[in-house]
Amino acid sequence: MITECYIKGRFDYGVGKCAVVITEDVPKGEEKKVLHQVAWRVPESWEYNGETIVADQFNCEILAATYALQWCMKNHKQLVNIYANTTTCQKWYLRREFPESRKASAQAYIDMLEAYKKAMDEHDDTEVVDRVFVEYIKKDDKNVWNWLVNDIALNVK
């Protein structure tokens, strides 16, 4: 079971970077076990839903958050709270609401959560919900997972 998911998005000197660390739940007093850890450079801009998104601090962070949520759902069938490196963004992730000026940047994150909500609305059994959602992120060419891996060139498994 996943206990924590930390993300970091940075934009320094014209270079965007993302990092994600996901840890496993362990008994109190034991050292946390890292389940997954990845970092990557971000292109200057990218496309999602016909919108051009330019790399900046927030956009790097939302990209990391989207990846983290996707990985947790795909590999552990578990939604998680995301701990961000900025308190403003942290509030947005917890509420899952974003200011209007950031809607285009956050659309991939929002789309993924909407797909999960739709699966929950259609099925009562949590195992079925998880399976429906995981199948969605594995097979649809236009989904967020493939967009992250292919369009953003984040070649992780």
What are these regions (language model features)?
Residues 1-59:
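RNase H-like nuclease fold core
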Residues 4, 24, 30-31, 44-47, ...:
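Glutamate identity and glutamate-enriched acidic tracts
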Residues 59, 63-67:
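Short amphipathic alpha-helical face segments that pack within enzyme cores
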Residues 66, 70-152:
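RNase H catalytic domain
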